[in-house]
């Protein structure tokens, strides 16, 4: 093997650049050539491919977003489009592809694997919803951004005796809501993985008022419903001075945390080591702080990410 390709796909996540750097540098230091593919699978099919230079990778480990850009490209679900992508890879002499991204990105790598092309998936998404890994690149940064925003909102809630319903990202997973909610002492954390009772939440906030806590913070995962809708339903069960806030895309950007930079570096280097061993068709990740690799087809077809819902029980035990 002489050449590998790298692409980022789907929603951007802080730490993707650190992964790109690690993959490219590890490949170059092993005597391989690294090729970047701009705009994800769309750029792959269009041949937007270039040879990477080590000197251009010096200042990206600390940057959010992705220097390779990203684009949604649902057309890659079609067999004909997948084969066009493989043609481009062969045209550039690229013998293996490392894909950094989330669920949709992994399915693209899975399809390439099914066509006999060597691909490895690196988990990069703020949602932390990829099977085969405890944590994804970008999750820690997003959770920290959400935590900082919730701390600020809580200051205002305290000052004005208000109840805030704050919607955080996560797609269909409640991990960002759970982790940021626990870290900010939320009165309630509402996630898709568990049933919830809005009336019971309202009663708890009313009870808190009687016991001396005159403000409230509800952290809501976007996979449940929107903040405005939740607030409207909450207000039916109490006389609250409530506000609804959606944090939105602020959770994706910004400098990655130390955890995301190190995780991305470990996973990027691991992808190259596996390729050098002649292995491929894999989804890589981290489990109990150990790097792991699983068959990407089996991982996507037979496994699901498991959100640690016991964290919600923890929050219930330590809240006001």
Curated annotation (Swiss-Prot):
It comes from the Bacteria. Gene3D superfamilies: 3.40.50.450, Phosphofructokinase domain. Its EC number is 2.7.1.11. It holds the Pfam family PFK. Mg(2+) binds at residue 103. ATP binds at residues 11, 72-73, 102-105. ADP binds at residues 21-25, 185-187, 213-215. It is found in: Cytoplasm. Pathway: Carbohydrate degradation; glycolysis; D-glyceraldehyde 3-phosphate and glycerone phosphate from D-glucose: step 3/4. Its cofactor is Mg(2+). It catalyses: beta-D-fructose 6-phosphate + ATP = beta-D-fructose 1,6-bisphosphate + ADP + H(+). InterPro entries: ATP_PFK (IPR022953), ATP_PFK_prok-type (IPR012003), PFKA_ATP_prok (IPR012828), Phosphofructokinase_CS (IPR015912), Phosphofructokinase_dom (IPR000023), PKF_sf (IPR035966). Keywords: Allosteric enzyme, ATP-binding, Cytoplasm, Glycolysis, Kinase, Magnesium, Metal-binding, Nucleotide-binding, Transferase. GO terms for biological process: canonical glycolysis; fructose 1,6-bisphosphate metabolic process; fructose 6-phosphate metabolic process. One of its GO terms (molecular function) is identical protein binding. Allosterically activated by ADP and other diphosphonucleosides, and allosterically inhibited by phosphoenolpyruvate. It is an enzyme of class 2 (transferase). Substrate binds at residues 125-127, 162, 169-171, 222, 243, 249-252. The active site is at 127 (proton acceptor). Catalyzes the phosphorylation of D-fructose 6-phosphate to fructose 1,6-bisphosphate by ATP, the first committing step of glycolysis. Belongs to the phosphofructokinase type A (PFKA) family. ATP-dependent PFK group I subfamily. Prokaryotic clade 'B1' sub-subfamily. Homotetramer. This is ATP-dependent 6-phosphofructokinase. It comes from Ligilactobacillus salivarius (strain UCC118). The gene is pfkA.
């Amino acid at each position: 093997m002489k050449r590998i390709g790298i692409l980022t796909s789907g929603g951007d996540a802080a730490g993707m650049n650190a992964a790109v750097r690690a993959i490219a540098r590890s490949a170059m230091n092993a005597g391989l050539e690294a090729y970047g593919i701009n705009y994800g699978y769309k750029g792959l099919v269009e041949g937007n491919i270039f040879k990477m230079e080590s000197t251009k990778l010096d200042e990206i480990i600390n940057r959010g977003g992705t220097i390779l850009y990203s684009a949604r490209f649902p057309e890659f679900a079609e067999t004909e489009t997948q084969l066009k992508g493989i043609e481009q890879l062969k045209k550039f002499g690229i013998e293996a592809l490392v894909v950094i991204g989330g669920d949709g990105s992994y399915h693209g790598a899975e399809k390439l694997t099914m066509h006999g092309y060597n691909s490895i998936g690196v988990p990069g998404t703020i949602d932390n919803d990829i099977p085969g890994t405890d944590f994804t690149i970008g999750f820690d940064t997003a959770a920290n951004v959400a935590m900082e925003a919730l701390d600020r909102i809580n200051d205002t809630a305290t000052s004005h005796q208000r109840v805030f319903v704050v919607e955080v990202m996560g797609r269909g997973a409640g991990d960002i809501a759970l982790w940021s909610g626990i870290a900010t002492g939320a009165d309630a954390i509402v996630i898709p993985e568990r049933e919830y009772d809005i009336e019971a939440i309202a009663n708890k906030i009313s009870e808190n008022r009687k016991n001396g806590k005159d403000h409230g913070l509800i952290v809501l995962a976007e996979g449940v419903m929107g903040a405005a809708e939740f607030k409207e339903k909450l207000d039916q069960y109490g006389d609250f001075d409530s506000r609804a806030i959606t944090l939105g895309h602020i959770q994706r950007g910004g400098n990655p945390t130390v955890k995301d930079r190190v995780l991305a570096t470990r996973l990027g280097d691991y992808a190259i080591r596996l390729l050098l061993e002649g292995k491929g068709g894999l989804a890589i990740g981290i489990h109990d702080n150990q790097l792991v690799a699983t068959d990407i087809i089996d991982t996507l077809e037979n496994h699901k990410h498991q959100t640690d819902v016991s964290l919600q029980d923890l929050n219930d035990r330590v809240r006001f």
